């Protein structure tokens, strides 16, 4: 179809193609908007400190330790307040595995229909500070929805051809 009018005029004759092409255009727009509107803050904080920017405030509230079967978890508690006053508690963790001795960062991810918010933390060597990375990634869910639409259009086309034969 060339215009929106053609899309509605032809109705279901090319339904699979329309769904897949709509999914692809949604994918391109989602990636574009994600790239334009993403933001990231990388800073070093210790317990009790606060990082302030014009868009949000990140407060490092507390650290808890938790012993699991094959690793020890260090869980940070952060409060993120955006410019609108929305309050968000994030809890990224560091995992220290026993055999072999490996340290990994586990992100805390908060997702809604428009944005994903990620936070990770790492040790800063020989200091009481932790390296904090906070990212806001808009339209991540829409990237996945567009991929599902592309696959759905392909499946409809596949089964439609099978049914016609």
Show where each model-derived region lies.
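Solvent-exposed, non-transmembrane regions of integral membrane proteins
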Residues: 1-165
């Amino acid at each position: 179809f060339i215009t929106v009018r053609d899309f509605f005029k032809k109705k279901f004759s090319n339904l699979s193609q329309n769904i897949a092409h709509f999914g692809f255009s949604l994918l391109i727009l989602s990636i574009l908007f994600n790239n334009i509107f993403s933001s990231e803050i990388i800073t070093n904080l210790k317990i009790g400190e606060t990082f302030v920017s014009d868009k949000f405030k990140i407060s490092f509230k507390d650290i808890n330790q938790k012993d699991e079967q094959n690793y020890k978890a260090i869980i940070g508690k952060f409060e993120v307040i955006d410019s609108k006053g929305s309050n968000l508690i994030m809890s990224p963790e560091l995992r220290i595995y026993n055999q072999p001795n490996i340290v990994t960062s586990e992100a805390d991810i908060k997702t809604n229909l428009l944005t994903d918010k990620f936070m990770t933390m790492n040790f800063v060597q020989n200091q009481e500070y932790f390296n904090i990375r906070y990212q806001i990634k808009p339209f991540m869910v829409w990237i996945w929805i567009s991929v599902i639409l592309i696959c759905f259009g392909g499946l409809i086309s596949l089964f439609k051809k099978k049914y016609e034969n």
